[in-house]
Each structure stands twice: as structure tokens, then as C-alpha cells.
From Swiss-Prot:
Necessary cofactors: [4Fe-4S] cluster
Chain location of the short sequence motif DEGH box per the record: 257-260
UniProt source species: Bacillus subtilis (strain 168)
Residues bound to [4Fe-4S] cluster: 133, 197, 200, 206
The protein's name: Probable ATP-dependent helicase YpvA
EC number(s) recorded for this UniProt protein: 5.6.2.3
Gene expressing this chain: ypvA
């Protein structure tokens, strides 16, 4: 216990939780209102309910409406509890954009530090893909003569290029530091799961490695994404077996911000990705050693089976509109090829045990190959048990992806069985007032819950136009959207269900000569676009991923346009969910997903008692039943257009 760092004093007559309760009351009733913050009954109610979850070390679903100030509440508890226990608390956000929202200059952590005179040790633990890969940068520089790559290389810290004594190493390579690169450009130089980091000669000068070392030493908060936290959970044991540290250090508590999105993050983290060239790389490395002829022939057979599997997979896959995932059609033929490859990989796994006793292969290299072969064999066996699967293609490279259908059992065992506080925070956690659906999907059997409404007067602050009478095409919607942008002099967030629709608007809007800059997700690092949008008021932001969490109070945002109803794509992941529905796939999968996204999208507009503006929802072409369902989740009566 590090009581000297607690933001309040402990006495002999009262325990930590009693003193914490008193301090939280002082903060919300006296200290923050004196600094200009609103006194919100909903926020105070949530705070005193949350104390029970920390005291009893339980799971809590904290459903709090927009504007409750839930982030301030869970931050105060997380910081205090981390200092009391002596281990950092984890704040897991839905994605990297929301991490940046939390730690920006005018974000909630900065507000608490300033107004409560606290020094908060906050460190970011971003997903691997958010970091530069030195090896990929070298390859990109070799095949492209664009000056931007040379400029990037020369901007790297001196210790990357030089080997000398007494050098000071520090974290670098974060995506945010290269905001000018588009998403496509970034993918050419960023980490991907097929990089062989364990044997990389630049490993100890790598920005990802140095960043990990840095955030592990946090004493208060480590902020990561849901994906990264789940990757930590699934890889913790295997990393220990390989002699590596887990991705995250031992921690005191976990807060899942936008917690309704955790199930998909868990599925994503449990996903196995198999690239055609990776097995070739590992097995051909073995062939360079002095191995038995019988083993060499087995490797050759496996390489042929690998080529055959990916050939069949490519032949039997088709593209899906609105998704980068290719659907596998003739499952039987692919499974037959997978069965043969899996059989040979199992044989290689057995042979590797024998080879390890011959000492003809470097033991570390052997363990790396063994781990990969085992993982690939498991992926193929998972596929044969009807897991969710698809194919991805980039340039000439194919990647086979396998994802489990459910994660409830493994989550219940590996995560929620631990006796620490787990807080789920979101405006949309329950269905019809019940938290059973989300609890069951995550393997949670014992939990606390609370629900508080939004403190905002939506009838006074918001108007909604629902375009449902006529089915507009993209050109008509573009013209209407441009008119609303002009009316509000920019200050508009346009939300799209997919990049295809965003790019269509991007192309059509280029013909209009608007005096207001339009920022499109994908053109730059997204948190830098959000920053520009907030600082330069007369601008427009178009996004696919900002339905949740975006917090822009004030005059920078006066208008939110929902381009079309955000139904899930018809890709393998949601097709599997539909196939698993008990009665009606549309009622159980598509409709709830769409309504949740609409509620979240609307929540971007009003972020303070002083905010006002309008929502425009394009739902033309949908039947009356769907329109009625949309109207039920709207906070005010819409104007039907």
C-alpha cells in the first residue's frame, strides 16, 4: 500500500474506502463546482455506486447516459485504488482514437491533474500496429524513391542508426508522430503480425520494444485499447513460456470504456492469422540446417500442402460488398486441403521434438518454429470445427483468418474469475433494462449494475431530421449534406457505416466548391484530424470509426449527419452471428447492432449543457417497421422529411 501518494489522508478511525467516499464527495460537491464544473446528481449517484465494485472487487456494468461525466468518476476511483494497492489500473478504450481523446490537453485526465493538483502517471500502451517497423521501413525505402520515407528515416532517434556507449534510449515510433501519412502509407511501414520480432536484430532499438518498457513502469494508469488488453490475456501464458514478459504488468483494476464493444475485441484478439509465405519462411529456415533426410522430405511435403491449401482457398473465395473479408464458398474442398496440411504439421511437430535432441538446430530458433507450427496446426483444427473464417488479400499475398464463434467460456475462466474490480462504462450496455445479454456473452455470472440517465434537456438542445419519405441516391444525399454544411458554416460530423460510402461522398463532394475544409478519415492519423476539426471551427469531419467516444463540446460541432443506417456488413463474422441466431437473424443481430450505432452516433452532438445543434439521419428506402424502431431510440421527436 502506497498511502503517501493517496490524494487524501488515512486515519486510524476510518478505512481506505470510507476516506475515499468522503474525498469523492468533496470533489464532486465542493472542489469541482468551485472550479466551474456542473454539479450533476447523476454523476454523484454513479460515484457512490462504483465504490461498492472496488470494495467487493466485482464486475460492475455502469450504464450512464451522455453527459453524466462517467469518465471523471472512474478515473478518480482507478487512480486512488491503484495507489492504495500499489499496482497501476488499466483503462481499456474501444480503440486508439479514444485513447487520444482521454489524454489530450483538454481531456479528463488533464482536467483532474489541474483542478485537483494531482500528478497522474499516465502511460499509453497502444496496439502493435500503431508502431513503426524499422525492417518494413527499410524495405519500403528500397522499392520506393519517395522522399517522405527518407525524411522519416532521418527523423528517427540517433540511437537507431548508431551503436555507441552511454546512449539514452526513449520511446518513439508511435503512429501519432507520423500523422501526415495516410492509413495506406502507414501500413507499408508499420508492424504487422507476420514480422518475426523475436529474431529481429533491431529488436532492442525498436520503438515498440522501448514503448513497452516505458509503460510497464507506470504507477497510476496504463491506457490501452480493448484489442490490446485481450491480446495480453490470450498471450500471457505463451509469452511466459517463451521467456518474455506479458504485454501488461500485474494490475489492480480494469475499466472497459465503451464496454459494450468488448466481446468483438475478445474475438478479434483470439483470431489466428495464417499467411502463405510465413510457413515457407520458417520451414525453409530449418532446411538450411543439418537435418535428417526423412525430416527434410516431410518439410517439402508440408510446403507443397501449404501451397495447395492456399490455392484451393483462393479459388473457393469470393468478395463481399462493404467488407475487406473474402467469403469461403466451397467449405468441403477447403477443409479437405486443410486436413492434409494439418496432418503434416502434426508430424513436423513430433519430428521437431526428435530434432531438438540431436542439437543440430539452434534451440531458440527451434522453439520459435515449434511455436508457429503448433499455432498454425491449431488454427486449421479450429477451422475444421466450424469457427468463423475468411480470406484476406493484399497485393499478391493471401492471409487465412480464423476466429472463434464465442468467447464467453474462455473469458469467464481467464479474465473475470480474477478477484479484482472490472468496470464496464458506456451509455449503451443494457437491453430493455437487463444486463444479462452482455454478461452471458462475456462469461460473467456475478455482477453489480447501475443505470443513470443523461442530465441534458434534449428537447431544448437538439433537433432531429429523419429522411425516410424518399429514397435518395448518393448524389442527392451529397447535395443535401452540403446544404446543411453551408447552413452551419462547417461544424459538421458526417458518420458513415463503411469506407465505400465515405469514399463515394469524398468523390462527389469534390465537385462542390466549399469554403470549409473537409477532413476524411484515412487521409491522416485520425486523432490529428479530430484535433484539427476541434481547433478550426469552420471545418467538416467525415469518419467511419467515430460513432463512439468522440467528445467535442462547444461551437466546433453543431451538426451530426448519419449518412445511412449503420447495419452490419454481410461479411463472414456477421454471417456467422446471423447463422447462430435462435429465431430471426435480422431481429437478433442486424437490428440491435444498427440501433446501438445510431444511439452512439447521436450522442456525439450534445456534450455539455451549453451545446445545441441538429441531427440528420438518412433512412430512405427502409420499411416502416425499421423507421419505427429508429424513432423509438431517438431522444426527441424527429421531423419526418
Amino acid at each position: 500500500m502506497t498511502t503517501s501518494r493517496l490524494p487524501f489522508s488515512l486515519t486510524k478511525t476510518k478505512n481506505f474506502y470510507e476516506e475515499l467516499n468522503n474525498w469523492i464527495g468533496d470533489v464532486f460537491y465542493d472542489i469541482l463546482p468551485e472550479k466551474g464544473f456542473d454539479l450533476r446528481d447523476e454523476q454523484v449517484f454513479m460515484a457512490f455506486q462504483l465504490e461498492r465494485a472496488f470494495k467487493e472487487k466485482k464486475v460492475m456494468f455502469a450504464e450512464a447516459g451522455v453527459g453524466t461525466g462517467k469518465t471523471l468518476v472512474y478515473l478518480l476511483f482507478a487512480i486512488s485504488y491503484a495507489r492504495y494497492v500499489g499496482k497501476p489500473a488499466i483503462i481499456a478504450c474501444a480503440d486508439e482514437t479514444l485513447i487520444e481523446q482521454l489524454v489530450k490537453k483538454e481531456g479528463d485526465i488533464s482536467k483532474l491533474a489541474e483542478h485537483l493538483d494531482l500528478k497522474i502517471d499516465t502511460r499509453l500502451s497502444k496496439s502493435h500496429e500503431q508502431y513503426l517497423c524499422l525492417k518494413k521501413l527499410e524495405k519500403t525505402m528500397q522499392r520506393s524513391d519517395d522522399d517522405k520515407w527518407l525524411d522519416l528515416y532521418e527523423s528517427l532517434p540517433s540511437f537507431v542508426h548508431e551503436s555507441q556507449a552511454m546512449q539514452r534510449f526513449y520511446p518513439y515510433g508511435d503512429r501519432k508522430q507520423y500523422a501526415n501519412l495516410s492509413n495506406e502509407e502507414w501500413s507499408d511501414v508499420s508492424y504487422d503480425s507476420f514480422q518475426d520480432c523475436l529474431t529481429c536484430d533491431m529488436r532492442h532499438r525498436c520503438g515498440l520494444t522501448l514503448s513497452r518498457d516505458y509503460y510497464r513502469k507506470s504507477t497510476d494508469l496504463i491506457i490501452c485499447s480493448h484489442d490490446f488488453y485481450m491480446e495480453h490475456v490470450w498471450t500471457e501464458e505463451s509469452r511466459k513460456r517463451e521467456g518474455q514478459l506479458p504485454l501488461l504488468p500485474d494490475h489492480s483494476a480494469v475499466v472497459f470504456d465503451e464496454g459494450h464493444l468488448l466481446e468483438f475485441a475478445a474475438q478479434k484478439a483470439l483470431t489466428y492469422r495464417v499467411k502463405q509465405s510465413t510457413l515457407e519462411l520458417f520451414l525453409e529456415r530449418l532446411l538450411q540446417n543439418d537435418i535428417r533426410e526423412e525430416f527434410a522430405e516431410l518439410i517439402e511435403d508440408a510446403l507443397l500442402a501449404n501451397d495447395e491449401f492456399f490455392y484451393v482457398l483462393s479459388e473457393e473465395s469470393k468478395e463481399v460488398a462493404g467488407s475487406h473479408r473474402l467469403e469461403i464458398k466451397n467449405d468441403h474442398r477447403v477443409k479437405k486441403a486443410a486436413d492434409e496440411l494439418c496432418r503434416l504439421l502434426d508430424k513436423i511437430g513430433e519430428a521437431l521434438v526428435f530434432e531438438s535432441e540431436m542439437y543440430t538446430i539452434d534451440q531458440y530458433e527451434l522453439s520459435v518454429v515449434e511455436e508457429y507450427v503448433e499455432q498454425m496446426a491449431y488454427s486449421l483444427s479450429l477451422y475444421q470445427k466450424d469457427a468463423i473464417s475468411w480470406l484476406e488479400k493484399k497485393e499478391a499475398e493471401s492471409t487465412f483468418v480464423v476466429m472463434p464463434r464465442t468467447v464467453a467460456e474462455v473469458l469467464g475462466e481467464k479474465v473475470f474469475s480474477k478477484k479484482i474490480p472490472y468496470i464496464f462504462s458506456s451509455a449503451t450496455l443494457s437491453e430493455g433494462g437487463s444486463f444479462d445479454y452482455i454478461a452471458d456473452s462475456l462469461g460473467i455470472h456475478d455482477y453489480l449494475s447501475l443505470t443513470v440517465d443523461s442530465p441534458y434537456d434534449y428537447d431544448e438542445q437538439m433537433s432531429i431530421n429523419l429522411y425516410a419519405k424518399t429514397d435518395m441516391d448518393a448524389e442527392q444525399k451529397t447535395a443535401e449534406t452540403i446544404e446543411t454544411i453551408k447552413r452551419y458554416k462547417g461544424r459538421t460530423l458526417v458518420l458513415f457505416p463503411s469506407f465505400e460510402e465515405l469514399n463515394e461522398f469524398k468523390e462527389l463532394s469534390a465537385a462542390w466548391e466549399l469554403p470549409y475544409p473537409i477532413f476524411f478519415e484515412g487521409d491522416e492519423e485520425i486523432s490529428s484530424l479530430v484535433e484539427k476539426f476541434q481547433e478550426e471551427e469552420e471545418t467538416v469531419l467525415c469518419s467511419v470509426h467515430l460513432w463512439e467516444g468522440l467528445d467535442i463540446p462547444g461551437d466546433a460541432l453543431k451538426n451530426v449527419t448519419i449518412w445511412s443506417l449503420p447495419f452490419p456488413p454481410h461479411d463472414p463474422v456477421f454471417t456467422a452471428k446471423r447463422n447462430g441466431a435462435k429465431k430471426d437473424p435480422f431481429e437478433e443481430v442486424d437490428l440491435p447492432y444498427m440501433l446501438l450505432r445510431v444511439r452512439q452516433g447521436i450522442g456525439r452532438l450534445i456534450r455539455s449543457n451549453q451545446d445545441s445543434g441538429s441531427i440528420h439521419i438518412y433512412a430512405g428506402g427502409e420499411n416502416e417497421r425499421i423507421i419505427d424502431e429508429v424513432k423509438k431510440v431517438l431522444p426527441v421527436e424527429p421531423h419526418m422529411m
